[in-house]
Amino acid sequence: SNRPMPLNTYQFRNMIQCTVPSRSWWDFADYGCYCGCGSGTPVDDLDRCCQVHCNCYRQAGEISGCRPKFKTYTYECSGGTLTCKGDNNACAASSCDCDRLAAICFAGAPYNDNNYNIDLKARCN
């Protein structure tokens, strides 16, 4: 898709590359019902990671003026371990933590090729 990528997506992408270096971040951009924030019932554990991430963003968005999809933050990747830095404000800290937890969740969830680019209308009611 040619939709413009939110700034923060670039950081989330780098976080995923930190925890799951063996896969392209694109593999996670269109997976299951929730990787891309959809609806319905998550198809598997990886999709549940995305559902939690979407809900996390929704909660962060309740902070006044916070748009987690666009919020940049400071973090560090060292040997596959992600750390959100202490100089983030409340919005940045929340956004960073949402992305950090999702990237860790992705690393621990099996990837099922059959759940990539699925028919959302048919499978996500």
Curated annotation (Swiss-Prot):
Q: Where does N-acetyl-beta-D-glucosamine bind?
A: F28, H53, K69
Keyword terms: Calcium, Disulfide bond, Hydrolase, Lipid degradation, Lipid metabolism, Metal-binding, Secreted, Signal, Zinc
Protein residues bound to Ca(2+): Y34, G36
Tell me which InterPro entries the record gives: PLipase_A2, PLipase_A2_dom, PLipase_A2_dom_sf, PLipase_A2_His_AS
Which GO cellular component term is one of those annotated?
extracellular region
Q: In which tissues is it expressed?
A: Expressed by the venom gland.
Query: What is the purpose of this protein?
Result: PLA2 catalyzes the calcium-dependent hydrolysis of the 2-acyl groups in 3-sn-phosphoglycerides.
**Name of this protein:** Acidic phospholipase A2 5
